[in-house]
A protein has these predicted regions:
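Signature of N-terminal electron-transfer/Fe-S-associated modules in redox systems
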Residues: 3, 20, 33, 79-80, ...
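N-terminal loops that bind phosphate or other acidic moieties
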Residues: 3-8, 12, 51, 96-103
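Compact, glycine-rich, soluble single-domain proteins
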Residues: 11-61
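Detector for Asparagine
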Residues: 14, 31, 92, 98-99
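Long, contiguous binding/interaction regions
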Residues: 28, 79-80, 101-102
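C-terminal structural segments of small proteins and small subunits
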Residues: 61-64, 68-98
Length: 103
């Protein structure tokens, strides 16, 4: 049986680019899936589950990256990772002020 492959090009929208914190968020999310994940910038392709590899891309605001996932959960992995990038890496940071029981 062939493994599913899904890919999409995304643009880094956060002003600080893909520095340590968002790279860590990306890698942690990628590692929740069994699919392999790769990220391509220009002619360079790196392991999307390795923070050091992601950081070597030096992706700044406006950089286009192609994310590819291959495996049983490729579509779900790609959707989650693209949403994270599209939202400027803010998905895992809900405002605690909005959850206050005192409001």
């Amino acid at each position: 049986m062939m493994e599913a492959t899904a890919s999409r090009t995304v643009t880094i929208v956060n002003p600080q680019g893909l520095h340590a914190r968002p790279a860590d968020m990306f890698v942690k999310l990628a590692n929740r899936f069994s699919s392999t994940v790769s990220v391509r910038k220009g002619h360079e392709t790196v392991d999307g589950k390795s923070i050091l590899s992601i950081l070597t891309l030096g992706a700044e605001e406006g950089t286009q990256l192609e994310i590819t996932a291959t495996g049983q959960d490729a579509d779900a992995a790609l959707a989650a990772l693209c949403e994270l990038v599209d939202q400027g890496f803010e998905l895992n940071e809900p405002s605690e002020a909005n959850n206050s029981p005192w409001l």
